[in-house]
Amino acid sequence: MTEITGLTAAELSEAIHNRSVSCVEVMDAFLGRINTLNPDLNALVNLMSPEDCLAMALESDQQLSSGNSAGWLHGIPIAIKDLFNAKGLATTLGSPLFQEIGAQQDDPHVARIRAAGALIIAKTNVPEAGLGGHTRNALFGLTRNGVDRSLSAGGSSGGAATAVSSH
């Protein structure tokens, strides 16, 4: 089997649902990848603690063991762009002005992603307020390109682009 972090979302969903891989194994693999790459790339910000991430994954495994799947994203770790609210995570907009404000509820599209079973574990870095051609802000700093560190990760969705390209 391909390394867990190299699977597409559809392949990962199938592997989780046919129980060839557990949600905990998936989370552990992605946390390992994040720990290896994110210090240099700075794609993900406001990452939940590994313990909280693994606890969510264990709960997802227990749901599957009981015959309950929330949907095709069940047990798959997901990061949300730091311009959108995800309950329990700060929505900073890449600005020090908003760093202490935690989201009280999910934005509608985030709620749909969560309802499909996704495990929201982090935010992706953005330029301040999502404005700018490069993902750099005073709060989290520069996001590097996941393929070529000498190139820009781009603006607005630079953190998301880097997270996907460096999988």
Spans of model-derived segments:
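Short, basic phosphate-binding NTP loop
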Residues: 56-58, 62, 138
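An N-terminal boundary/leader segment
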Residues: 1-56
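Solvent-exposed, non-membrane alpha-helical residues enriched in polar/charged side chains
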Residues: 13, 17, 61, 110-111
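Short glycine/serine-rich loop/turn segments
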Residues: 73-167
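Immediate post-signal peptide segment of exported/extracytoplasmic ligand-binding proteins
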Residues: 60-77
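N-terminal Rossmann-like NAD(P)+-binding subdomain of aldehyde/semialdehyde dehydrogenases
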Residues: 41, 59, 84
